[in-house]
Amino acid sequence: MNIPQLDSTYIANTYARFPVTIARGKGSLVWDADDKVYIDMATGIAVNSFGIADPAWIRAVTEQLCTVQHASNLYYTAPDAQLAQLLCEKTGMKKVFFSNSGAEANECAIKAARKYAADHKGPEYHTIITLKNSFHGRTITTLAATGQDVFHHDFLPLTEGFAYAEANNLDDLKAQVAAHKCAAIMMEVVQGEGGVIPLTQEFVKGAAQLAAEQDLLLICDEVQIGNGRSGKLYGYMHYGITPDIVSTAKGLGGGLPLGATLLGEKVQDVLTPGSHGSTFGGNPVCCAGALSILHRLDGPLLQSVREKSDFIVKALTGAKGVRSVTGLGLMLGVETERPVKDVISECMARGVLVISAKNKVRLLPALNIPMAQLEQAVSVLKDVCAGE
């Protein structure tokens, strides 16, 4: 059997895969099993921050792999302590809990928020307000946090204690807070799976003010938009707010599984021994790779992300067959007149890999994609959208 046949025979049917078997890659180029080359504008869904087989990242993880690959959290290791220090220094947060994915990072954020509320106001203050059209993960609790019924219907009953407000509707958010005994407000500043839709400045700042007034924790889910993808280190930094908790993953590990929950001053000591844990969380190899990523997310790199974003937006806005371009930094959604599936398929045939988010083409290129490759990929997408 070939690889697709092996996959369909032995792997659970949870993914609708594209008809491409990725064999190898280098930077923003990937080759399939037939040696056809593609420009990668998806990066494993915003994971490969510096593309495939990035030399500095490979050196970091290989050196650590040949030293200690795993020790458990019963002992100290250097990479996780150093990574936590760097994350706190770059964000102003105080403590970090490491896990293996965005869903796990969000689980930790939810647990920390509920424990803080129980400790300070009582266990009945457990409701977390999230936004409609949000996506926070696929565990039974992060599904409950996700404000999209399409993900809920097969898995009832979900974890209780979540309510949903309309995104960018501050009055509705206030109404939901008033109607429940709340622990926190949780949001993605750019709703990724919901269609790459940024929240407005007015709404985010209003939500932060509301949280402060009501003694609620503010949780920012930075799983997809975080780690430089927005053009700042984290997306919330575009809004001039300071969350109490930040969850992130994807691009932080650069290709290895790593989640992080950053805890601000108010909640830095809320998690105590035995209250949470993860066997693999803070794995030294994953953290070594993340250190390589995070050290390079500096001013010049972030400026280049913003410049590349401006290029894409300018090139596609108003182009034939393009209805709108939304998003932030190098996390963009392109609403097309043609069906999204057709656009993705035709781009693939022409050697460009893009993915979808609801009714949009989603663009998630490597942060360091060369301009020549970016220009070529955008040119292909423009032609496909125009039906040329």
Please report, for each region that a protein language model flagged, where it lies by residue.
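Conserved N-terminal phosphate-binding loop of PLP-dependent enzymes in the Aspartate aminotransferase
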Residues: M1-E388
